[in-house]
């Protein structure tokens, strides 16, 4: 059975992007397959246990900003936020970075350990049924998608209905969220 852990370990974080407050991380396998991890909750990028960038920083101007903060609109400032600055200065030149380990918290949190002392933490911050993060294979006819929303995680496939997996089950196994559909 394939799971998110099996799919991510050994891949390399190759690129990142964001659309408003949706953070997109792309992981490339040795055969060129690209897996995407999209976060709509708290995401932290660390280097040797120091914070490089946080998804909360998309709402703050970069350090070079010298205008009126009351007129600054984060939604119109792609590339000019404190998050963008942290990613550019703290992560860009280190890419690609190999994924060494993947673990999960009790509430659907994800912890990725990368080479060179980097790590990624995705922390679910809501009790609602809103989607917190999504993992999928890019440009693939048989979609592999893992979604964390509320108290359950789902494996979504083109030909299969949603299949729930409870969060306590995830925490006990610490191996992934669902299976390939």
What are these regions (language model features)?
Residues 1-181:
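Surface-exposed, interaction-prone regions used to assemble/regulate multi-protein complexes
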């Amino acid at each position: 059975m394939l799971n998110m852990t099996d799919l991510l370990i050994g891949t390399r974080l190759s690129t990142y992007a964001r659309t408003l407050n949706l953070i997109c991380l792309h992981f490339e396998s040795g055969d060129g397959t690209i897996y995407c991890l999209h976060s709509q909750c708290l995401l932290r990028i660390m280097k040797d246990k120091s914070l490089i960038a946080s998804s909360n920083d998309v709402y703050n101007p970069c350090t070079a900003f010298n205008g009126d903060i009351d007129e600054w609109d984060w939604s119109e400032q792609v590339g000019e936020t404190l998050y963008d600055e942290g990613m550019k200065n703290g992560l860009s030149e280190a890419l690609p970075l190999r994924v060494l380990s993947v673990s999960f918290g009790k509430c659907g949190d994800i912890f990725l350990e990368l080479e060179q002392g980097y790590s990624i933490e995705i922390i679910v911050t809501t009790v609602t049924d809103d989607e917190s993060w999504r993992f999928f294979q890019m440009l693939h006819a048989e979609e592999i998608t893992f979604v964390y929303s509320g108290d359950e995680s789902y494996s979504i496939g083109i030909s299969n209905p949603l299949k729930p997996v409870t969060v306590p089950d995830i925490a006990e196994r610490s191996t992934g969220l669902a299976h390939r559909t």
